Amino acid sequence: ATNLGSASWEDYLTSRETDDDQSTVVSIKDLMSFDSSNDPDNLIGQRWLTRGSSMIVSGGTGIGKSSLMMQIVIQWALGKDFFGIAPVRPLKIGVIQAENDKGDLAEAFQGVGFGLNLTGSDMKMLQQQLEFRTEAVRTGDQFLAYARRFIHKSKLDVIVADPLFSYFGGDLSDQGEVSVFLRNKLQPILQETKVAWIWMHHISKAQRKDGEPMTTMELAHAGFGSSELANWAREIAVLAEVGQFKPRRFQLAFCKRGGRLPKPIINLQHGTDRIKWEEYNPLVITGAQLKEKKPFNNKAKRKDSI
């Protein structure tokens, strides 16, 4: 028999396309028929975070990232908004963390819960919607396999891993290592499970030029490590302290998709009487802050006035 098989090598390669190859196809019909206001994969905001997407939340050491994370996951697990950032429904959330023991977690949970005035029914709901795990040993492939089992077992919508440093298991400044970990090892888990993945991360020392604060795009790359981190994630959030105030004040900037939120930057401060993050108006100066300002020194005179 003659004229059997492919006419050319290119035709042969085309015929060998796998199901995985076909799953990457997006047709013009798909694009035209997509309804962004009714996306079944939407989880939070106006398609801000979707199923299978990712976010990195970066901030300095000792500024309260753990309590911030606690407040976020409690609100979203209850189906409530975090300063205007609202989930489409109560989300099933899992947290894996390495830096706090059970007592630390309990203090943060109880403190934030008291600050948010959670009710008995809220607590009952959280028992179903929110899970915590402490894992301080596994890194790299072993950690990802552990997280994958957790996602499947608990049918998670969102998983938070805190911090990235503890679980990467390599050199975060090595772009090759970071790319393989995020794109070749973690991303398939997100595609398989459709979970939204949030890393908590440490920020490198902020570099300011000419006394000016960093721009949003500069903040996006402020997390310690390779720029591949910012390239990979759907959203980058950076918590940075502003000024010297009591209570301490911060800006939470959403650097990549903040335009999908009510506000791309949220002005936050530590609660004055409880463990809770509160929003403040940066244009309002209180009487106490005015008293803290140094009085004008009228003894200091210019040389040419003597």
Functional labels for PLM-detected ranges:
Residues 1-21:
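Short, small/acidic-rich helices and loops at N termini and domain boundaries
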Residues 155, 276-306:
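DNA transaction DNA-binding modules
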